[in-house]
Every structure is written in structure tokens, then in C-alpha cells.
């Protein structure tokens, strides 16, 4: 069986048709603890209950058995082959010794987190043909006694956490029109929140909340406003119907304000002169009332986007001091190459400042009051012309998450510098389920560039970069940081999983896995012993960027394929 991908000059995937599968390898731990709002908002250090460990998106753990003095002794204690090829991006999610992991193609594994023994496996029944540019998945959400996963055919499935059996299955949109889901859901307030991918397929983005018990729709908020809704005037004619603004990275949540924050993607088609206007709410952060879905506030990072710089990564909710005042900030290392600091409140998102953290030549200036950029017309793609710009469409940071450590006070960014792009703008006609970009792309590297990938550490109170580590390869590795004064990440084509000193950036430990790592790391403890976990499995845009760099550099980089969950600990 062949998965139907839309026609596009990108890597095509031949997917074997999947059939439903469920198995129980051994009894699941009988003391599975229900996941409540209280636990999600104040998780125990031993668990990793959500995508970034906490709903503020820090990617930080208070565990410190593994620290900067002993991490050199870290060793693998078990590994588990997923049996799946392609890019493995999901973090291992852990609740009281039970690990939940997803793979490309919508498999969900429940595993004994200490031993690596399989507890159950669920394989989603995908149709014989479905439309998706990427078949990856970014993980599960836990709530109550259920595990929630979102699928490539635009469904959300609730599974019994102890058995893996399906409880409910809800369709959120029609995959035939290019809607598909790769994100991990956000679970809070009795609701399961998801958006969809498909920004290159002429979709109209949205965020939908489903009842966690029944799967029934509670509310739906579109990220491109229709006539009569605020912001529709920023779209000419009927262009809002296919305007994009996809939501494909999990949101974060402020429990005191009752607001869920989500980032949105690029407009469609890619070239801005085909849809003049600001094109709200593309390339923005939205604050949604968790009860109603009402958009309470927004900030648009760049208007009338023409570079494919999705700003889907949700800002980190963290404290930042500015001019002697502590603010509740939203901090966002943008794909557009700027590091954004915003202030959040119950009914507003206000601009604080923005500075480039990689080389960027498309913005001529940024308004110091509003944060609205002014563009250099030489570097803004237009229809019928070929335009160069920096960074390339993959941006200063794509979706892999940054992290914040409150003990070092530093923000850690998986960045890419020294790469630029070329877009040839073309007219395009919308056809349901087909590519709707109107662009031909290339990648370039400035002469003399000695590296691409970086890990940057920033003190957001001073707005200064404290240290940087450079890699010859691009860096596609989400970051985990801990109370052990450590950061963990993969992301480079050399297959290495690394630990750095969180204060200085010194490399302390590395381990070569079976494949490149684009999975997001997590950490947890069982019976008082700390573990660090990550999925290896190269693919998706990281592999695409590797191929583009090889073309530019005249190199041939081989990265083995295949998904493996790796779990590390100190020797007993």
C-alpha cells in the first residue's frame, strides 16, 4: 500500500499500510497513578508527565543524582528498537515507572521505564492512502487514566493507560483536504488540545479542545479569521480560506491566568505578494482562554511571511528581569532568527525586545514599541523573482525546543547559523490535498563558514549570550536541562548524544547511538535512581537539511536509519 503524498519536489515516502495491532507483553504496573491538573501543574521530580516536563515549557528537571561531577560515568542500561524507520521526534513520557513513546506512523509503546520490558503496544489503523508531508509524531499526552495520541489522518485517540485498549477515537478534520497531525496534545482542565499540520497544503489552521472523557468537541478556534472576525481584514478576498497558520507543536499553559499559549505557522501560499496584508494570525503566539477558546491576546513575530519561517514553537513561560522589574515573560527563539522577549498578562501580550541570535538579513529594523519588523525588500521573496535571504527556511531554530534552567538562570537554544536560502516565487492554484506553496527553494552556505549548528546559552535578564558551542553539522536537537548543572541534547548528524556543563558549556560526556537524534530527551527516576532517555532515529527535515548541505559542500553524509529508545543511568 502506498501513502498518498501531495506532489512536491521533496523527499517522498513509501509507507507500508498499517493495520490495527494491540498486544500485552506482560501485566502493566497495577499502581498506575491518574494524571490530574494538580500533578501536571506541579509534577513530581521523578516523573516526566508532559512534553517539556512542566506546562511552562522549561524542559527542566530537579533531579540531580546525575550531575557535572559524575556524568562521565553515564552508561546505557537498556535500549528498545521501535521497528520503525524515519524521524523519531517524541520525548519519552514517564508516569511512576511507565514510559510512553510514539513513533512515525502512529505507534504507541508502553514500556517498563526501569527494565525496558514491553507492557503494551498500540498501532493506529491508518487508511490505505493518506495525505502528509511528514509521518512523524511528537508524543503523547497523559490525563486521568488515559493516554492521548494524535494521528496522521487527523484524529485524536484515547487509550487506556494500563492496557493500551482504545477508549474513544475522534476525527478533528478531513485528511483529504491536507489536514494531518504530528503534534503531541496538550492536556489540561479536562480537555485535550490539538492543532494540525498542513500549512503547505492550503489548510485553514485551528486549535480544537476535546472533552478528555468522551472525545466530544468543546470549542474550536481558527488561527485564520473568517469575515466578521477580528483580523479578517488582513486577508484579501477569499485568501483566508487557505491561509495556513498551522499549529503543529504542543502548547504551554499558565495555570494562574487560565491561558494556553500556542505558536502558529506560515501563511499559504508562501509568497506574500499573493495575499497582501498582515495575514493574522500567522507566525504568531496566541493566548487562548482554556474555558472558551477565545483569543485573549496575540503577538505576530513577522507579518505577510514569505520565507516559510513557521513560528510554531511555543514561547517558554519564564521570569525575566528588565530595568529592575520582574516580568512574566514569553521567551521565543524565533525561526526568523530573532530572540523575542514578550510580557504576558490576563488580556495582553506586549513587546519587550528582540535581538538577532543568528545572522539575519531580511529585517531592516524592528519597531522598539510594537516589535513590528520592517523588511529589506532585497531579501523578501516575491512572485516571478529569485530572492536570497538568511537564515534559510529552516531558520535560526526550527521546532526542536529550547530549555530554561532556573538555577543557572540561562536559556539554552539549539541554533543553526551560517546557512541561507533562495526562493523562486511562482504563481500557484489551490487544489485540495495538493502542495500549495508557489516556491522553488535552494540552500546556500556563506563562503568561509566553519560551522552550522550551535548550542547557545543566554542570560535573559541581561540579554547577553553567555556561551556557545559549535558543530560542523546542523543542530536539530531539543534540549533537556537538570539540577545537576547539565544539559543533554543530540541533533547532529554524527549520531552523538551529549551532556554539557550547563554553566560553562564544557562537553562532559558523549555517546554514539545507532542513528542521529532528533528526539527530545527527558529524565525521570524509578526507586530513587535517575535515568535519562531519548529516541534516536534520523529523518524528516533534519535529513532534508543534511542533503541540502551535502549538495552545497560537495560532501556525502551517511546517517543510519532506524528508531531506538536509549535509556542511560549511572552504574549501580
Language-model segment annotations:
Residues 522-572:
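Blade-level signature of beta-propeller repeat domains, shared across WD40, Kelch, NHL, RCC1
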Residues 26-76, 223-230, 373-379, 444-445, ...:
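Blade/loop signatures of beta-propeller domains
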Residues 57-173, 481-482:
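N-terminal cofactor/phosphate-binding cores enriched in small/glycine residues
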Residues 194-205, 262-279, 417-448, 537-557:
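Short, conserved, GDST-rich strand-edge loop motifs in beta-rich repeat architectures
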Residues 180-214, 303-364, 378-390, 394-399, ...:
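Repeat-solenoid scaffold signature
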Residues 80-93, 121-141, 166-184, 201, ...:
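Extracytoplasmic beta-rich repeat domains
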Residues 48-52, 87-107, 131-156, 180-204, ...:
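Repeat-blade elements of multi-bladed beta-propeller folds
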Residues 159, 205-216, 278-293, 343, ...:
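Beta-propeller blade signature
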Amino acid at each position: 500500500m502506498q501513502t498518498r503524498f501531495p506532489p512536491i519536489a521533496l523527499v517522498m515516502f513509501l509507507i507500508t499500510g498499517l493495520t490495527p495491532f494491540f498486544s500485552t507483553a506482560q501485566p502493566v504496573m497495577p499502581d498506575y497513578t491518574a494524571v490530574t491538573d494538580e500533578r501536571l501543574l506541579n509534577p513530581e521530580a521523578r516523573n516526566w508527565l508532559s512534553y517539556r516536563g512542566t506546562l511552562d515549557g522549561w524542559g527542566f528537571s530537579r533531579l540531580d543524582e546525575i550531575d557535572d561531577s559524575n556524568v562521565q560515568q553515564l552508561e546505557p542500561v537498556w535500549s528498545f528498537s521501535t521497528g520503525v524507520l524515519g524521524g523519531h521526534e517524541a520525548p519519552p513520557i514517564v508516569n511512576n515507572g511507565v514510559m510512553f513513546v510514539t513513533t512515525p506512523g502512529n505507534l504507541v509503546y508502553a514500556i517498563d521505564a526501569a527494565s525496558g520490558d514491553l507492557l503494551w503496544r498500540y498501532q493506529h489503523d491508518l487508511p490505505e492512502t493518506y495525505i502528509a508531508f511528514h509521518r512523524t509524531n511528537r508524543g503523547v499526552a497523559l490525563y486521568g487514566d488515559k493516554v492521548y495520541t494524535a494521528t496522521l489522518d487527523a484524529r485524536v485517540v484515547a487509550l487506556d493507560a494500563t492496557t493500551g485498549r482504545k477508549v474513544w477515537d475522534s476525527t478533528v478534520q478531513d485528511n483529504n483536504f491536507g489536514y494531518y497531525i504530528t503534534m503531541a496534545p496538550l492536556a489540561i482542565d479536562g480537555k485535550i488540545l490539538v492543532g494540525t499540520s498542513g500549512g503547505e497544503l492550503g489548510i485553514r489552521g485551528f486549535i480544537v479542545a476535546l472533552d478528555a472523557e468522551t472525545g466530544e468537541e468543546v470549542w474550536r478556534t481558527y488561527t485564520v479569521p473568517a469575515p466578521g472576525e477580528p483580523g479578517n481584514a488582513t486577508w484579501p478576498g477569499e485568501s483566508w480560506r487557505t491561509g495556513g497558520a498551522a499549529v503543529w507543536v504542543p502548547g504551554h499553559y499558565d495555570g494562574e491566568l487560565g491561558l494556553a499559549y500556542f505558536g502558529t505557522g506560515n501563511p499559504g501560499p508562501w509568497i506574500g505578494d499573493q495575499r497582501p496584508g498582515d495575514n493574522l494570525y500567522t507566525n504568531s503566539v496566541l493566548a487562548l482562554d482554556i474555558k472558551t477558546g477565545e483569543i485573549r491576546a496575540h503577538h505576530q513575530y513577522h507579518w505577510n511571511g514569505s520565507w516559510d519561517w513557521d513560528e510554531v514553537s511555543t514561547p517558554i513561560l519564564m521570569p525575566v528581569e528588565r530595568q529592575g522589574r520582574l516580568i512574566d515573560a514569553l521567551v521565543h527563539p524565533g525561526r526568523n532568527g530573532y530572540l523575542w522577549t514578550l510580557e504576558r498578562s490576563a488580556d495582553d501580550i506586549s513587546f519587550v525586545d528582540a535581538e538577532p541570535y543568528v545572522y539575519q538579513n531580511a529585517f531592516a529594523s524592528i519597531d522598539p514599541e510594537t516589535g513590528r519588523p520592517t523588511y529589506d525588500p532585497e531579501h523578501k521573496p516575491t512572485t516571478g523573482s529569485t530572492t536570497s535571504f538568511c537564515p534559510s527556511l529552516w531558520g535560526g531554530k526550527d521546532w526542536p525546543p529550547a530549555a530554561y534552567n532556573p538555577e543557572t538562570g540561562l536559556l539554552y537554544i539549539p541554533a543553526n547559523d551560517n546557512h541561507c536560502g533562495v526562493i523562486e516565487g511562482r504563481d500557484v492554484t489551490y487544489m485540495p490535498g495538493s502542495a500549495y506553496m508557489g516556491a522553488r527553494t535552494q540552500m546556500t552556505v556563506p563562503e568561509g563558514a566553519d560551522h552550522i549548528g550551535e548550542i547557545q546559552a543566554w542570560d535573559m535578564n541581561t540579554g547577553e549570550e553567555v556561551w556557545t558551542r559549535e558543530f560542523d553539522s546542523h543542530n536539530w536537537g531539543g534540549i533537556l536541562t537538570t539540577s545537576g548543572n547539565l544539559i543533554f541534547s543530540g541533533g547532529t548528524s554524527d549520531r552523538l548524544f551529549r551532556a554539557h556543563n550547563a554553566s560553562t558549556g564544557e562537553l562532559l560526556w558523549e555517546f554514539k547511538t545507532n542513528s542521529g537524534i532528533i528526539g527530545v530527551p527527558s529524565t525521570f527516576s524509578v526507586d530513587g535512581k535517575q535515568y535519562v532517555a531519548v529516541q534516536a532515529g534520523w529523518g524528516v527535515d533534519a535529513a532534508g537539511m543534511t542533503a541540502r548541505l551535502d549538495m552545497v559542500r560537495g560532501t556525502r553524509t551517511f546517517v543510519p536509519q532506524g528508531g531506538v529508545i536509549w535509556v542511560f543511568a549511572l552504574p549501580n
